[in-house]
């Protein structure tokens, strides 16, 4: 890596052990989608006993699916990875369909991703083994969920694909809109909105959905603040939230998120992995960083230190990178984004002095 002045090596902020392990960030999208709705049984009938029986029956089906998936992973490893390349995606599609039948859409999504790995380029056997290990870990988490701490058990249920309600107490705050961006597949458009509470110092994620080709309804302008209540969903990190009552329309604000160094950001991701081993990234604001070239990519280097975080490869092909470079002009800036095993994805930036937020996504 290059330092901010282009000379000498800048050591990267250390990525936690086990961090470099996933092919892309599509896993979280699937699990967030399946967990976004209301608690299915109780909302539909209002009969707690009937809801309990349905939940038990579904848990039994998920358990059967997880057990079958474990055996298929064992068969894969015993038969050798070359068989996975020869079989193509059909084997995985069949297994994914079995997980859908077991009412475990989160497992189905992860299984489908396995099918795409053999064609993902050099190094695919290592990536396939890593993904199989994470899938095995999720299977075992479900099968032994009663032995897990409550927060981790809730995360496992969410990752498997069970719906949950936003049961946290409403938290009223002036929520700064940190970033907003969409991802899409053939069926769904997902909008992610990151917020930061001025008083609670909490970062929260709102999810909104639209049919394929249609933008979700929820739109919050980046850089403005919203006086509103949020309620958290029950997972280990409790970052996902539902938007409740709004007391005023979004308005301009001088609020900025409190920033970290690049080394502190890497540590935060490592700590988050202890609560959610399947986590792709965490929201982080970096303070006083400078975008600098790094070979055929870019990095954000600490202006006052000797560490840096590489930008994700997809960032280099986006116009937001050049907006970030232009905003910085070689001077330190504050950057909010997502920090994970693939690097840092910048989403919004603020100049060193007074000035509005600049959306990069």
Summary of predicted features, one role per range:
Residues 34-158:
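Extended alpha-helical scaffolds
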């Amino acid at each position: 890596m290059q330092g901010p002045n282009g000379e000498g090596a800048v050591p990267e902020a250390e990525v936690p052990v086990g961090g470099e392990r996933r092919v892309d960030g599509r896993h979280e999208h699937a699990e967030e989608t399946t967990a976004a709705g209301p608690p299915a049984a109780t909302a539909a009938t209002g009969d707690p006993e009937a809801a309990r029986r349905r939940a038990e029956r579904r848990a039994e089906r998920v358990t059967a699916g997880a057990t079958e998936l474990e055996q298929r992973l064992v068969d894969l490893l015993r038969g050798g990875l070359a068989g996975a390349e020869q079989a193509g995606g059909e084997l995985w599609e069949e297994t994914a369909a079995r997980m859908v039948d077991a009412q475990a859409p989160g497992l189905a999504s992860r299984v489908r991703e396995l099918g795409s790995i053999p064609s993902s380029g050099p190094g695919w056997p290592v990536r396939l083994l890593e993904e199989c290990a994470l899938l095995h870990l999720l299977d075992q988490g479900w099968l032994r969920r009663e032995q897990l701490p409550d927060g981790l058990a809730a995360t496992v249920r969410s990752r498997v694909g069970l719906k949950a309600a936003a049961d946290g107490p409403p938290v009223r705050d002036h929520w700064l809109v940190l970033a907003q961006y969409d991802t899409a597949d053939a069926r769904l458009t997902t909008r992610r909105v990151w917020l930061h509470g001025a008083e609670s110092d909490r970062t929260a994620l709102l999810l909104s959905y639209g049919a394929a080709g249609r933008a979700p309804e929820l739109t919050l302008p980046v850089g403005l603040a919203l006086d509103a209540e949020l309620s958290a969903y029950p997972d280990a990190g409790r970052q996902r939230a539902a938007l409740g009552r709004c007391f005023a329309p979004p308005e301009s604000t001088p609020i900025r998120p409190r920033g970290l160094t690049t080394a502190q950001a890497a540590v935060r991701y490592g700590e988050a992995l202890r609560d959610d081993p399947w986590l792709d990234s965490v929201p982080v604001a970096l303070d006083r960083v400078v975008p600098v070239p790094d070979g055929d990519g870019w990095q954000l280097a600490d202006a006052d230190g000797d560490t840096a975080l590489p930008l994700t490869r997809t960032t280099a092909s986006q116009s937001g990178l050049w907006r970030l470079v232009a905003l910085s002009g070689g001077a330190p800036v504050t950057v909010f984004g997502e920090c994970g095993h693939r690097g840092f994805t910048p989403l919004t930036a603020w100049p060193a002095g007074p000035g509005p937020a600049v959306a990069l996504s």
